Amino acid sequence: NVFKELAQKKWGCMSAKQINALSPDQLQTWQRTQPQDFSLDQVQALSPSQLTTLSAVTLQKWSQEIVQSLLPEQIAALAPDQMRPLLKHLSPLQLAALNDRQMTNLTPSDIKQLQPVQWQALTPTQIAQLPTDALLGLNKSQWRDLKPEQIAALTQAQFKSLSGDAL
């Protein structure tokens, strides 16, 4: 297979236009052979639908620099399981791109990964979308880092789920 040979030996030579033209089958071939070899320009050339064909295992192998090069529309296209391994590397702008499907699938362990600057980047709407059990993952420091508008966004169900220890 010519493409497999190219993916194994000459991946870095492909232009952004060539990357953007890859089919799902070609991306799967690349994923099996060279999961870490995308350049920043190549990652940004991937369409949101192309990104959805990549496995969470592949995405987890990407460096923080590669993850932070993803565009907001690429982040929004990811399935919750694809987004999860990237969460700790997302910039505030990328976090703002998380949609309701992604927010409602966050777990306590996902929340624990967030640094103060990331946590504060979540919009009030995103805070209101968090599952009640995800809030149980917050530590006292994260609670202190909440902005007033984020606290105001908490729903009744979210408040009811909180223990005295959380506050």
Write out the residue ranges for each language-model feature.
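General marker for long, soluble alpha-helical cores
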Residues: 1-167
